[in-house]
Amino acid sequence: MGTSVSNPTAILQTMQGFLRKWWSEFNLQTRLMAAATLVVSLLMSGLTFWAVNTIQEDAQLVDTRFGRDVGLLLAANVAPMIADKNLTEVARFSSRFYENTSNIRYMIYADPSGKIFFGIPYSEETVQNSLTLERRIELPQIDPHNFDQPFVRQHHTPNGDVTDVFIPLQYQGKFLGVLAIGINPNPAAVNSSNLTRDVTIAVFISIWVMVILGAVFNALTITQPIKELLLGVKNIAAGNFKQRITLPFGGELGELIVNFNEMAERLERYEAQNIEELTAEKAKLDTLVSTIADGAMLVDTNLQLLLVNPTARRLFAWENKPIIGENLLENLPPEITAQLTQPLRELAADQGSLLFSPGHGPQEEEQDKTYAPEEFRISLTQPFPRTIRLMLTQVLDQNRENLRGIVMTVQDITREVELNEAKSQFISNVSHELRTPLFNIKSFIETLSEFGEDLSEVERKEFLETANHETDRLSRLVNDVLDLSKLESSKIYQLDAVDLYQLIEQSLRSYQLNAKDKQLQLEKILDPDLPFALGNYDLLLQVMTNLIGNSFKFTKAGGKIIVRAYPLHRSNLRAEDGPGLVRVEISDTGIGIDPEDQAAIFERFYRVENRVHTLEGTGLGLSIVKNIIAKHQSQIHLVSEVGVGTTFWFDLAVYQSMLMVVG
């Protein structure tokens, strides 16, 4: 019970609060106008209701008089018939009277005891059941002594309002009963009842409509232009120079609008010029930043990323990551974060007076406030080993007093480090290779020069052969360097028919004696239908010599070296491979190549010998092979397993009576 009472109370309080808040949002002028409109509308609606209601009451009075007159007329005519008990004539007369008078709804005759003996338009059965009919019509109790004047009343039925007229039936001073007549109300009176409501509501609404229309007209003619001007001024102040006022007004207000639009147009042109200049400068900067080979990042003083160029995204695998706005230290690899956290935080803390120099500590520099970048070299292990160089530089404002951010440039110097290491190794190898033959040559020549007369002919000849051998070794080293230089240049080589039988025979012939000395088995497996290949004989001979020489170098005594050559069948070829290919393979049962060396074995200066502790060769042989095969529009491949052996193979196009020149 308490809940049912409190809920309406709470709802009422909520509505009151809402109305109070809604009313408080209007200004004083609007409140006064609304109050005045409400008073006038209520006053006019009340006057209208009173006037129309008076008309309705007059119409009801007319209906009452009409019903009484009709009842008296009918009673005067039927009373003699009832006195004579001529009910047939009563029925005939009453029916004719009922049919000719449209306003009569029913006619009922009752005797002095109140029993109904005739009624129109009721059936005989209904009339006989006078109790039912009496209840339906609601006949009054009849008192003959006090009932000498017509009695009029109105009551409501499901079919509408009815005016009931009860007339006493008297003849020659004798009370014969009661005549009840139901009169339909005047349609004008019924309509006037609805008209009262409609006109009252219409007057109330019309007053509010006129007031609202007046307010709208006032807003459109005066208030709206002022609001538009106010909004335009706010937009101009906010930097929106595209704001225009398009209201069609003349006079002083129209002139004010025109002047405002001209001012906005001039400001927009000025802004467009500035934006165009800024956009051009920004485009230049974006182009420069996006095209430089180094990675570049800009962070604010909170170390939040503001700009990252494509190179930096690629270096740190940020291509598909929304990195702008993220914290730099949270997204760098752990190795970089460990070294840069402290320096970045010191720079971000506005160490404005510090000049950082690579390899030196901070130095005071108050005169020109220029800042040298601090350099870091960091080795990464994920996702693959590499070395990067990072440089941190402060970004100051125009007066070079306040810190605005930090620029970090990133360089992937992995290749540079590898080349430096390879060159250092190469120089070491070449120095050793050059020093040994030169020392030997010098030693033997000095011996011959000083003790030549004391040496036998055989000894002098042996010394000269050794010096000659060392000279060949020195020439071979120099030739390797020169060959690689030529291959990497744009020199043009002519390709023609190459007899692979002859090429392989000549390559193996030069190693026959060495194979015997080292107890190695040399074997060739050549297809009997081996076609001529398209290539350069001298270059391919150098390829075979280098590959077979490598197999000799890394194959132990008792091992085997096999050279195969065979045409590839059509089922092994793709449509883009051309008319046909010949495959050449050099296999050995040597020590094999470790998988981590296989990816870099064709690089310049790379030497597997470093891992097996044999400082023979220059590290250029396989690089020369790779370049020569590339000149033949092909690639060198290898398959190797440590402790099992290695197979190098490449494909050559079949010669088709054509002459090609390649560069």
UniProtKB/Swiss-Prot annotation:
<dbReference type="InterPro" id="IPR005467">
    <property type="entry name" value="His_kinase_dom"/>
</dbReference>
<dbReference type="InterPro" id="IPR003660">
    <property type="entry name" value="HAMP_dom"/>
</dbReference>
<feature type="transmembrane region" description="Helical">
    <location>
        <begin position="165"/>
        <end position="185"/>
    </location>
</feature>
<feature type="modified residue" description="Phosphohistidine; by autocatalysis">
    <location>
        <position position="432"/>
    </location>
</feature>
<keyword id="KW-0472">Membrane</keyword>
<dbReference type="InterPro" id="IPR013767">
    <property type="entry name" value="PAS_fold"/>
</dbReference>
<feature type="transmembrane region" description="Helical">
    <location>
        <begin position="199"/>
        <end position="219"/>
    </location>
</feature>
<keyword id="KW-0812">Transmembrane</keyword>
<keyword id="KW-0808">Transferase</keyword>
<keyword id="KW-0597">Phosphoprotein</keyword>
<protein>
    <recommendedName>
        <fullName>Drug sensory protein A</fullName>
        <ecNumber>2.7.13.3</ecNumber>
    </recommendedName>
</protein>
<feature type="domain" description="HAMP">
    <location>
        <begin position="220"/>
        <end position="272"/>
    </location>
</feature>
<dbReference type="GO" id="GO:0006355">
    <property type="term" value="P:regulation of DNA-templated transcription"/>
</dbReference>
<dbReference type="InterPro" id="IPR003661">
    <property type="entry name" value="HisK_dim/P_dom"/>
</dbReference>
<keyword id="KW-1133">Transmembrane helix</keyword>
<dbReference type="InterPro" id="IPR000014">
    <property type="entry name" value="PAS"/>
</dbReference>
<keyword id="KW-0359">Herbicide resistance</keyword>
<feature type="domain" description="Histidine kinase">
    <location>
        <begin position="429"/>
        <end position="656"/>
    </location>
</feature>
<dbReference type="Pfam" id="PF00512">
    <property type="entry name" value="HisKA"/>
</dbReference>
<keyword id="KW-1003">Cell membrane</keyword>
<dbReference type="InterPro" id="IPR004358">
    <property type="entry name" value="Sig_transdc_His_kin-like_C"/>
</dbReference>
<dbReference type="InterPro" id="IPR035965">
    <property type="entry name" value="PAS-like_dom_sf"/>
</dbReference>
<dbReference type="Pfam" id="PF00989">
    <property type="entry name" value="PAS"/>
</dbReference>
<dbReference type="InterPro" id="IPR036890">
    <property type="entry name" value="HATPase_C_sf"/>
</dbReference>
<dbReference type="InterPro" id="IPR052545">
    <property type="entry name" value="Light-responsive_reg"/>
</dbReference>
<keyword id="KW-0547">Nucleotide-binding</keyword>
<dbReference type="GO" id="GO:0000155">
    <property type="term" value="F:phosphorelay sensor kinase activity"/>
</dbReference>
<feature type="transmembrane region" description="Helical">
    <location>
        <begin position="32"/>
        <end position="52"/>
    </location>
</feature>
<keyword id="KW-0902">Two-component regulatory system</keyword>
<dbReference type="GO" id="GO:0005524">
    <property type="term" value="F:ATP binding"/>
</dbReference>
<dbReference type="GO" id="GO:0009635">
    <property type="term" value="P:response to herbicide"/>
</dbReference>
<dbReference type="GO" id="GO:0005886">
    <property type="term" value="C:plasma membrane"/>
</dbReference>
<feature type="domain" description="PAS">
    <location>
        <begin position="281"/>
        <end position="351"/>
    </location>
</feature>
<dbReference type="Pfam" id="PF00672">
    <property type="entry name" value="HAMP"/>
</dbReference>
<dbReference type="Pfam" id="PF02518">
    <property type="entry name" value="HATPase_c"/>
</dbReference>
<keyword id="KW-0418">Kinase</keyword>
<keyword id="KW-0067">ATP-binding</keyword>
<dbReference type="InterPro" id="IPR036097">
    <property type="entry name" value="HisK_dim/P_sf"/>
</dbReference>
